A protein has these predicted regions:
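A residue-level marker of the well-folded mature domains of exported/periplasmic proteins
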Residues: 1-268
Length: 268
């Protein structure tokens, strides 16, 4: 909040914010807007402030890819656990929506679900343990991100279930990519963060120059809207990619996100 106040004081043209708790920034963002400063919500939305742009990875699609991957990995259906991220993170809501939508007509049943406050990975371990108390007849675990998945896999390992239970998550962390080629994680969603950052930078400059961002320039135009709770605001989303052992080399290694040596470090 103090950083945004400083930028307001310095009369910035554009402020890009990445809120951990969007609701907490309501007053200061409204103040920036009242001073004629353009506000871009990056990666996460600040609700009800009528920002000038929301740019993020398509979070609903992230959830859809997770659901589709579990359906593919568990063709006979069965019980699954859903371990979501922080309940104050609006992206979690979108991911959950896409995930549940993807599972709607499947034969997979969410028999246990929980949220991890502040994205604390230890809470994921606790949730998987609680899920296993409900039933150890589980075919898949959806985790809000790869960090949560690391703890889920640890608990599955302790119960001799690692590699037998499909685990899906997001972020394409190095450790997750290693788990995928080693067989203890099924899929991670890769989010092209460099594309997100460069697009946000370009749109920030265009907003600052008073240009119309709905007009295409360098292949980028903003023509969608997202409801922030009170307002439909300009929305630009980046398409995520499901990464499995099959396309790891093509997406992650050839794309320069991680090196082959690092990803296959533990694979003989």
């Amino acid at each position: 909040i103090s950083q945004i106040e400083y930028f307001i004081q310095k009369k910035m043209d554009v402020i890009v914010i990445i809120p951990i708790d969007g609701d907490a920034l309501y007053d200061v963002v409204k103040e920036a807007k009242s001073k004629g400063i353009y506000v871009i919500c990056y990666d996460r939305i600040t609700p009800n402030v009528n920002a000038d742009l929301y740019i993020t990875i398509d979070n609903e699609m992230v959830g859809t890819l997770m659901g589709e991957s579990l359906i593919k990995a568990c063709p006979d259906g069965g019980n699954i656990f859903a371990i979501y991220g922080s309940p104050t993170d609006k992206n979690v809501e979108e991911v959950e929506k896409g995930f549940k939508e993807a599972l709607k007509d499947s034969n997979l049943d969410i028999v246990y679900s929980g949220y991890c406050d502040n994205w604390l990975a230890e809470l994921a371990a606790a949730h998987v343990n609680k899920g296993l108390e409900v039933t150890d007849d589980v075919v898949g675990v959806m985790c809000g991100n790869d960090d949560l998945a690391s703890q889920a896999v640890k608990v599955l390992s302790e119960n001799r279930l690692a590699g037998q239970v499909a685990v899906v998550a997001q972020d394409a962390d190095l450790a997750a990519c290693q788990r995928i080629v080693e067989g203890t994680q099924t899929m991670t969603v890769y989010k092209p963060i460099e594309q997100e950052a460069s697009t946000a930078a370009e749109l920030a400059v265009r907003l600052g120059n008073g240009e119309d961002i709905s007009k295409e320039e360098n292949g980028i135009s903003v023509n969608e809207t997202f409801n922030d709770g009170s307002n439909d605001i300009p929305y630009y989303k980046i398409t995520p990619v499901a990464v499995t052992a099959e396309n790891m080399d093509e997406v992650i290694i050839d794309g320069g996100f991680h090196t082959r040596e690092d990803v296959y470090l533990n694979v003989k």
